[in-house]
């Protein structure tokens, strides 16, 4: 069915979001059209504000509205441990369990030879710089349990072990192929507590 151009464009915009197919995008577009002007304006304003006001922390790479982020400026955290994650959603998932008290490093991707993504294409150099300049003695690699997550974990391990840095991996309470952001708090807590050395 053909829709008027403004609705078709709105459907197209919604369907660019991850996990949103044409059917859901169509539902969202029609819902948006039915919203009050005030709600639509607030929605648009919030989208633009998030895009303009958020940045990446210059230390850890986490999404933040302050640079450095509130985690990196928290001196009560354990300076000896850095937990390495794929993206900012994983930081939020780990923070929900309120049991990890070290710092983070966000890679903004994973090494993926099949997709042409190498170590230089992710936020790895700044991790090395941080480790050489800081007090961290352990890196916990908390990438997802996928082929790319495993490849990234092994690369980080081979890179850091010669420097005398202990490299551990989250325990396997997480299903292979699953994303950290979708794991429940108990699973994440056990994965940290039972981490294994790489």
UniProtKB/Swiss-Prot annotation:
Domain Toprim as annotated: residue spans: 80-175
UniProt cross-references to SMART domains, sorted A to Z: TOPRIM
One MF term in the entry's GO annotations: DNA binding
Entry keywords, A to Z: DNA damage, DNA recombination, DNA repair, Metal-binding, Zinc, Zinc-finger
Keyword S-adenosyl-L-methionine recorded: no
UniProt-listed GO biological process terms: DNA recombination; DNA repair
Zinc finger (C4-type) residue numbers: 57-72
Transmembrane segments: none
Purpose: May play a role in DNA repair. It seems to be involved in an RecBC-independent recombinational process of DNA repair. It may act with RecF and RecO.
Family of the protein in this entry: Belongs to the RecR family.
Protein name: Recombination protein RecR
Record organism: Streptococcus equi subsp. equi (strain 4047)
Lineage: Bacteria, Bacillati, Bacillota, Bacilli, Lactobacillales
């Amino acid at each position: 069915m053909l829709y008027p151009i403004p609705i078709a464009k709105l459907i197209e915009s919604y369907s660019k979001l991850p996990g949103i197919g044409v059917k859901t995008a169509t539902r969202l577009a029609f819902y948006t059209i039915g919203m009050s002007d005030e709600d639509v304006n607030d929605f648009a304003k919030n989208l633009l504000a998030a895009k303009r006001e958020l940045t990446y922390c210059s230390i850890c790479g986490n999404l933040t509205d302050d640079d450095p982020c509130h985690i990196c400026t928290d001196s009560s955290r354990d300076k000896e441990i850095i937990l390495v994650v794929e993206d900012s959603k994983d930081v939020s998932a780990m923070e929900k369990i309120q049991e990890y008290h070290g710092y983070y490093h966000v890679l903004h991707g994973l090494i993926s030879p099949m997709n042409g993504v190498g170590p230089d294409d992710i936020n790895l150099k700044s991790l090395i710089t941080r480790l050489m300049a800081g007090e961290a003695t352990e890196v916990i690699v908390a990438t997802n349990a996928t082929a790319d997550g495993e490849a990234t974990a092994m690369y980080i391990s081979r890179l850091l072990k010669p420097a005398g840095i202990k490299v551990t991996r989250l325990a396997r309470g997480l299903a292979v192929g699953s994303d950290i952001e979708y794991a429940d708090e108990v699973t994440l807590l056990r994965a940290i507590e039972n981490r294994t050395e790489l």
